[in-house]
Amino acid sequence: MHRYRSHTCGELRASDVGSDVRLSGWLHNRRDLGGILFIDLRDHYGITQLVARPGTPAYEALDKVSKESTVRVDGKVVSRGTENVNPDLPTGEIEVEVSEVELLGAAAPLPFTINAEDGVNEERRLEYRFLDLRRERMHRNILLRTAVISAIRHKMTALGFNEMATPILSATSPEGARDFVVPSRLHPGKFYALPQAPQQFKQLLMISGFDRYFQIAPCFRDEDARADRSPGEFYQLDVEMSFVEQEDVFQPIEKLMTELFEEFGGGRHVTSPFPRIPFREAMLKYGSDKPDLRAQLELVDITDIFEGSEFKAFAGKHVRALPVPDVSGQTRKFFDGLGDYAVEQGAKGLAWVRVGEDGSLTGPIAKFLTEENVAELTKRLSLAPGHAVFFGAGEFDEVSKIMGAVRVEAAKRSGNFEENVFRFCWIVDFPMYEKDEDTGKIDFSHNPFSMPQGGLEALETQDPLDILGWQYDIVCNGVELSSGAIRNHEPEIMLKAFEIAGYDRDTVEEQFAGMLRAFRFGAPPHGGIAPGVDRIVMLLADEPNIRETIAFPLNGNAQDLMMGAPTELDETRLRELHLSVRKPQPK
């Protein structure tokens, strides 16, 4: 028999009754019932119940073993009997009567209970992550991540993509987030940077003659944490394709996402094809360029209805309406609750009216609406008895953000929100440029390296604020999974695009010398995308925080509490790297 086990803890069934077996695992739980000791033994594969009778060496040994210790046990498989079957366990028809016990690794007193899923401080969990990962939910999440990455590789290869590795040590990048830098011992005073993304390298692969590239790429950004973003390190499915237009990128990614989310989504349906929504339309209808399409309500721009209005709350402002059908059964609490929610999002309040059986409008602002206002609102919003309308007014970006959040919350509270579904969309036609309202300066609004729609002619003849870029986002249930673009591969178009944003030619030539040099040697049209693996797994696992899907994440302050990183270097190491440390003075 094997030194540690003949079977796993998830393997034994009724057909194994009478067999002599050896198991190894962690002592998950213990119960003493009428002097008989019942032990749940857990390993990677499952749980098997052990039984130790009083007066036996096995009982004496197991009675002294602390929870989460590792043990090896020998014993005989016996039936639990029909009345004692545990239907929640695959091994629930049997138990193992233990005859011999070997303690493999004793566990110290636990900092928290392993088999209690909630109520444990996250900082403590991260400090003892090796214990936290023993919990069923966390173990399941990490295995899901493994399976998803394996499936991505298989599916991308089947779609004709080739997996290639790009450098981890590279040059610092002048755009994007802050770099993590690595000092060079051999080149005093010089530094490498960990890649924020393999962006330039994957484009260089296309220029090198490769056609369809992908990589499960580690990316490093010195930025703050969010619920959907891990500080420090994250992984993305990095993709680039040659001789493509926008739809050519969409097709394989849409197929991949549909198959991936159907396979691992736990029965939640994927709606396809994914709609293409222009950026401006998304902001007007949903108040966000990351719309949650499970919310079956849409905003309506009614600014024109109130142009020149004497109602000061709306006059001269951007006004958005949110019609909500069939709220006849809702009390004042529903309306006040949404008003409170809007205030939490930054609004001063939330105006509303409701439609009576006779079609008349009642509510806090009804008296300020003229007959013409009411007639136009009824027509524009297709109002009917039992409907309600919520209003937001202000600057475009402000009212979009607030009413976008209210749209989703109102859908949830009014029964207009789809559950158990993944609703994807593509956001397209992003503006190439935006104007800083304070300085009047024109700058890039999103990706400076995307190809402008209309090419050089558009840059030379159109108002910069009217130019759109070949840029796109893929969004699922209100979570942005990735941005992407058709790249600007022509040096003269790139230089002109940067000139409009206020960059002189020499600066661009210096900062992007490597890419511009490559572009001048026959670069193909190319484009790509890079969906975040961590965010994909977060959605599939239905977790609210991305750290729940990463084996060893940093905390919100970019610290590894388990390993004690970041650490200080001693003087010897600093001298080797030609560094000295200058800490900020306390304020």
Curated annotation (Swiss-Prot):
It catalyses: tRNA(Asp) + L-aspartate + ATP = L-aspartyl-tRNA(Asp) + AMP + diphosphate. L-aspartate binds at residues 175, 221, 446, 487. It is found in: Cytoplasm. Residues 199-202 are annotated as: Aspartate. InterPro entries: Aa-tRNA-synt_II (IPR004364), aa-tRNA-synth_II (IPR006195), aa-tRNA-synth_II/BPL/LPL (IPR045864), Asp-tRNA-ligase_1 (IPR004524), Asp-tRNA-ligase_1_N (IPR047089), Asp/Asn-tRNA-synth_IIb (IPR002312), AspRS_core (IPR047090), GAD-like_sf (IPR004115). GO terms for biological process: aspartyl-tRNA aminoacylation. Pfam families: GAD, tRNA-synt_2, tRNA_anti-codon. Its EC number is 6.1.1.12. Its main location: cytoplasm. It comes from the Bacteria. ATP binds at residues 221-223, 480, 532-535. One of its GO terms (molecular function) is nucleic acid binding. Keywords: Aminoacyl-tRNA synthetase, ATP-binding, Cytoplasm, Ligase, Nucleotide-binding, Protein biosynthesis. One of its GO terms (cellular component) is cytoplasm. NCBIfam families: aspS_bact (TIGR00459), PRK00476.1 (NF001750). Catalyzes the attachment of L-aspartate to tRNA(Asp) in a two-step reaction: L-aspartate is first activated by ATP to form Asp-AMP and then transferred to the acceptor end of tRNA(Asp). PANTHER family: ASPARTATE--TRNA LIGASE, MITOCHONDRIAL, ASPARTYL/LYSYL-TRNA SYNTHETASE. Homodimer. Belongs to the class-II aminoacyl-tRNA synthetase family. Type 1 subfamily. HAMAP family: Asp_tRNA_synth_type1. This is Aspartate--tRNA ligase. It comes from Streptomyces avermitilis (strain ATCC 31267 / DSM 46492 / JCM 5070 / NBRC 14893 / NCIMB 12804 / NRRL 8165 / MA-4680).
